[in-house]
């Protein structure tokens, strides 16, 4: 049953690595001696955000590449070229959501301890309210309608549709556009929080 569990395992890796790596990077940046020099430079906030995002994305995607490489070496399971593009898009969107969420947590908290505690708590909540641990059918209808927008569930469902049924993006449009909305919202929140913390730091 590895084909059915692999999408959830892949999202778990994206969840924890994306949240932990990005939040730790932001906390280390805030605690470094160069933090004040970055604030007084004429460089825009957007450039720092994009730089942090791309560096974290490179780390997370490297981990995913190693996972697929090990899967190919030990089981000789290869990804079909027909689904490679769609699979890459969903992985990229999922990694972006969790990385941006981790960056937001890093900007919201001051110390590494509180940031790591918030990251682990949020990751456990997202993992708990998913089909991986708790079947959604056991939840009340009201809670189930809210949990349906859990990015973990959206990503896992999209990956299952692509890996098992070779579904096109049109068949997973709900997951695709919802993940895009998450990315847009997190980018705006990160920019606002960084701008607010910059003004408070300067004052």
Give residue ranges: language-model regions.
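Transmembrane alpha-helical core positions of polytopic small-molecule transporters
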Residues: 12-17, 28, 60, 64, ...
């Amino acid at each position: 049953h590895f084909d059915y569990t692999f999408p959830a395992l892949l999202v778990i890796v994206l969840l924890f690595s994306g949240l932990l790596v990005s939040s730790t990077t932001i906390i280390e940046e805030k605690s470094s001696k160069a933090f004040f020099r970055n604030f007084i430079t004429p460089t825009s906030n957007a450039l720092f955000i994009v730089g942090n995002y791309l560096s974290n994305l490179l780390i997370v995607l490297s981990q995913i590449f190693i996972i697929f490489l090990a899967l190919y070496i030990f089981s000789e399971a290869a990804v079909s070229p027909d689904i490679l593009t769609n699979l890459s898009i969903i992985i990229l969107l999922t990694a972006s959501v969790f990385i941006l969420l981790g960056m937001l947590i890093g900007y919201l908290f001051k110390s590494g301890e509180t940031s790591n505690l918030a990251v682990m708590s949020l990751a456990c909540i997202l993992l708990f309210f998913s089909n991986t641990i708790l079947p959604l059918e056991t939840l009340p209808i009201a809670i189930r309608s809210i949990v349906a927008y859990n990015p973990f569930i959206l990503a896992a469902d999209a990956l299952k549709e692509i890996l098992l049924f070779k579904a096109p993006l049109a068949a997973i449009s709900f997951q695709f556009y919802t993940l895009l909305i998450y990315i847009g919202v997190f980018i705006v929140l990160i920019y606002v929080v960084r701008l607010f913390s910059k003004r408070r730091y300067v004052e």
